[in-house]
Amino acid sequence: MFKKNKFQILFTLFALLLASLACTMNIGGPDYPETTIQPSEQAVKNMQEQFKAAFASAATSGDVILTFTEEQLTSVLHYRFAAQNNPLITEPQVILRNNTMDIYGKAKQGYFVANVKISVQVGIDENGEPTINVVSSDFGPLPVPEGINTTLSAIIKEAYTGAVGPVATGFRIEQIGICDGFMVMAGKVK
């Protein structure tokens, strides 16, 4: 009887071990925002339509004002990351406050998943193009990937140019502001 119980205990422990290896383990990291933004293709389409309208009206005045919402930026990043084979993060959430864009997400390394928070400040270079500077990054207990600034800057810039697309030909940004859930870009069409 003792051998039978010992076998059952070992079998149960072995089954639990295999089950745990089949899953991923969340190992913490920064807290996610209290409210989550559901990405939607409609938010991306609305943003593209908004851009077309802004650039159409700029044909007469030359001035362009673009307004991005947290939902639009979350959706753009979600679909850009989802299209990658090995994305930097998954489940992105963009929060726009106090001239800072906070990007939350989940990073996976092996069987471990950690919450991530990357804070970036958006500026303008001498050519009127957006610049993205990583101010801080918290990958929880996971190591911060090498070249995070370059990689993230390229992803965000590609998302920006991909979302705005050909309607922005000749657009020169003069001001960028981030506050209370919105990012506003003002500029001129060359």
Regions found by a protein language model. Give the residues of each.
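Bacterial N-terminal signal peptides that target proteins for export
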Residues: 2-10
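Short, charged/polar micro-motifs that form catalytic or ligand-binding hotspots
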Residues: 13
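C-terminal motif of bacterial Sec signal peptides marking the signal peptidase cleavage site
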Residues: 19-22
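Extracellular/lumenal and peripheral-membrane lipid-interaction modules
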Residues: 24-190
